[in-house]
Amino acid sequence: MATVLVAAYGKWVRDQVRTALAASDTTVLEVTRGQDVRGAVAEFGPELVILDMQIANMGGVAVAIDLHLEAGAGRVPESKILLLLDREHDRFLAKRADADAVLVKPIDAGTLRRTMKQLLAAAPSASTADAAPAQA
């Protein structure tokens, strides 16, 4: 069973992700503030962290960078990172944050499930940043 942490300010985003992953053998945890992500990753060790670009006080890009730095220093376990972008042009920011994959909102449930499976099946050092096609 995989553990997925979803960080998004908007309840509709968290609900959309939870609904998309409901049929899979996945535990979905939620936080609404960017500053809470690091603690949740340290406590629960999720295999995948799904970050919305809009997280109350700390956006998805900043959280992704923080998680990479903390994992590199050995303070939190490594997790795959999926960024949920607001628009196609945000791919530039996602690359700067070294996200493992990106999806452009609105999220298609099937695409989200496939992307999650690809990320969880990938070797830890393999980058799949362009594995998930963007949604129009």
Language-model regions: role of each:
Residues 117-134:
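The C-terminal output helix
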Residues 49, 102-103:
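Two-component signal transduction core modules
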Residues 107-116:
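C-terminal output helix
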